Regions:
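Histidine-centered metal-chelating micro-motifs
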Residues: 42-44, 63, 79, 83-89
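Structural motif
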Residues: 61-63, 70, 86, 96
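Ligand-binding loop in jelly-roll beta-barrel domains
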Residues: 83-109
Length: 113
């Protein structure tokens, strides 16, 4: 039987020295992670060979940088990232941002820089 998932019970990890992530769903064919980024934080520009991702902002503002443009996502907005598309999530605002990263299949081990 499935159990409710939350950041209180999920496996936690730190990335980029100042950002947090919680594995809400961790399966071979699906990953759902809640992440938190403080102001000024950003991930390394990268792409995934197989994983299709969907970033969905829960609170705050997230900038998704692509080669040719930047997309600013507000609370309750999301964006799909196709496999092979270079991208970089950034928090260029003055407030913390929390968001979901949904990957299918999971993106662990699939990241290219």
């Amino acid at each position: 039987m499935s159990e409710p998932a939350s950041t209180a019970t999920a496996d936690h990890y730190v990335w980029g020295e100042v950002c947090d992530g919680w594995h809400l769903v961790r399966a071979e064919n699906l990953s759902v992670i809640e992440e938190r980024m403080p102001p000024g934080a950003e991930e390394e520009r990268h792409w995934h060979e197989r994983a299709r991702q969907f970033f969905y902002v829960l609170e705050g503002e997230l900038t998704m940088q692509f080669d040719d443009r930047a997309v600013i996502l507000q609370s309750r907005q999301g964006i799909e990232i196709a496999p092979g598309l270079p991208h970089q999530a950034k928090n260029t605002s003055n407030a913390e941002v929390s968001f979901l990263v949904i990957s299918q299949p999971r993106s662990h081990g699939d990241r290219q820089t």
